């Protein structure tokens, strides 16, 4: 469920060349569907990166054919126990209900900060969104104020132009953030592809786009999965909630349709859990408890 190799050759793209790993898995699933066993596979089920609530999306949309991936809790290693205590009081509640028996009982340490007033900008290749970059700046500053270390925070985006814009915002001379950090590069800012294989206690994802259409990164379930699974303890989405999560795109391509349904599912569950907010103060308060009303609460 990671990102495939980049195909640069035009001829390879034209003939739909795929990697040997993709062909191997395709053979496995073809055999599984037909009852034949062309390839024998073993799926690893234990992971020690993400809080159980953060792995729910991947279990529902990515790993469902092979069985669910187990989350970090119950804690099994001394380091994990120490890490939980470290995050206590400045994270989402890391505990699950003692009588938790279903996925719905597992707390989701994530929130969506709705930047409905933002506007995407495209000049040449790529997109950026200055309103989202400003909100990212504010959120990073507030996270550091409540006790995060800069090295515990990563900001990711599907668009390189947005990555560059956020880097500029975080390193703007004379800002309070740079004064606190001394070195703004301590906060990792990168594309989804660049952060594959990495992990951070807190991840902020800027989605950039504000138009209601079939967006490239929304159509790519594997890239979405990589974005969602970089965080160990807290995941924040910064973006236009309705544009990203409100529609299921009709497509003859099953993978595109499934990816769109996955984002819609995520949005529905975040709204149901009152984890969609309209301003950064509400998001910061949600680190302790989710205020009743979610986006219905008046913003500061």
Task: Please describe what each predicted stretch is.
Residues 1-2, 110-118, 205-208, 239-240:
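Short loop/turn segments at strand-loop or loop-helix junctions that form parts
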Residues 1-84, 158-160:
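Conserved coupling/interface region of RecA-like P-loop/ASCE motor cores
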Residues 18, 48-51, 55, 133, ...:
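Amphipathic alpha-helical transducer elements in NTP-driven molecular machines
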Residues 41-43, 112, 189:
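Conserved beta-strand scaffold positions in the cores of enzyme catalytic domains, especially
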Residues 142-145, 149-156, 160-229, 233, ...:
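Conserved helicase C-terminal RecA-like lobe
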């Amino acid at each position: 469920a990671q990102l495939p190799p980049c195909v640069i050759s035009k001829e390879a793209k034209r003939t739909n060349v795929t990697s040997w790993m993709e062909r191997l898995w395709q053979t496995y699933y073809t055999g599984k569907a037909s009852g034949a066993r062309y390839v024998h596979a073993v799926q690893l089920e234990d992971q020690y990166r993400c809080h159980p609530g953060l792995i729910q999306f991947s279990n529902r949309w990515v790993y469902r054919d092979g069985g669910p991936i187990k989350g970090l809790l119950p804690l099994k290693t001394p380091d994990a126990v120490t890490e939980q205590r470290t995050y206590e009081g400045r994270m989402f509640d890391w505990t699950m209900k003692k009588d938790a028996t279903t996925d719905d009982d597992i707390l989701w340490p994530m929130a969506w900060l709705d930047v409905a007033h933002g506007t995407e900008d495209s000049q040449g290749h790529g997109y950026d969104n200055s309103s989202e970059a400003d909100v990212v700046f504010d959120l990073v500053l507030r996270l550091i104020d409540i006790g995060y270390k800069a090295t515990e925070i990563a900001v990711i985006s599907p668009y390189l132009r947005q990555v560059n814009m956020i880097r500029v915002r975080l390193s703007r001379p004379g800002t309070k953030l740079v004064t606190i950090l001394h070195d703004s590069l301590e906060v990792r800012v990168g594309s989804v592809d660049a952060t594959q294989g990495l992990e951070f206690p807190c991840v902020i994802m800027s989605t950039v786009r504000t138009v209601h259409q079939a967006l490239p990164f929304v159509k790519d379930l594997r890239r979405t999965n990589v974005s969602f699974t970089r965080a160990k303890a807290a995941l924040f989405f910064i973006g236009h909630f309705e544009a990203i999560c409100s529609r299921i795109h009709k497509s003859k391509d099953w993978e595109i349709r499934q990816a769109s349904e996955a984002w819609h599912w995520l949005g529905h569950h975040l709204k149901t859990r009152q984890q969609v907010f309209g301003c950064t103060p509400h998001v910061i308060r949600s680190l302790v408890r989710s205020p009743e009303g979610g986006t219905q609460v008046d913003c500061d």
